Amino acid sequence: METLTAISRWLEKQHVVTWCVQQEGELWCANAFYLFDTQKVAFYILTEEKTRHAQMSGPQAAVAGTVNGQPKTVALIRGVQFKGEIRRLEGEESDLARQAYNRRFPVARMLSAPVWEIRLDEIKFTDNTLGFGKKMIWLRNSGTEQA
């Protein structure tokens, strides 16, 4: 199975991302419900500009994070670690992402928070259901996939 396809299928079944940003040596992490775009390999989230993580991100910033389940045994651990870039969307790009986000999370229609894109440049997917410590790696710019 193609690495990105396997990762995308799993991410589409999850809904909470943890991401971390840094500014002047200070780190901060946050959680949010996400919409995953398989074509752009990106998460879309809503978060207010007044939050600490949004203030630290500014209009765009380097980001790293995780998506994971809550398995009861080590044999069932599956999760993603990633790095990339977070940026606030504007105009039509924001409108289109918000429409898609609202389809997945209808309650979000009540929120006015800006839409942010987390573009993934590197993904490591651990899937112990395929064997203990099984890792799949996807890199945006090299076209490299490792299983």
UniProtKB/Swiss-Prot annotation:
Gene3D superfamilies: Electron Transport, Fmn-binding Protein, Chain A. It comes from the Bacteria. InterPro entries: Split_barrel_FMN-bd (IPR012349), UPF0306 (IPR011194). Belongs to the UPF0306 family. This is UPF0306 protein YhbP. It comes from Escherichia coli O7:K1 (strain IAI39 / ExPEC). The gene is yhbP.
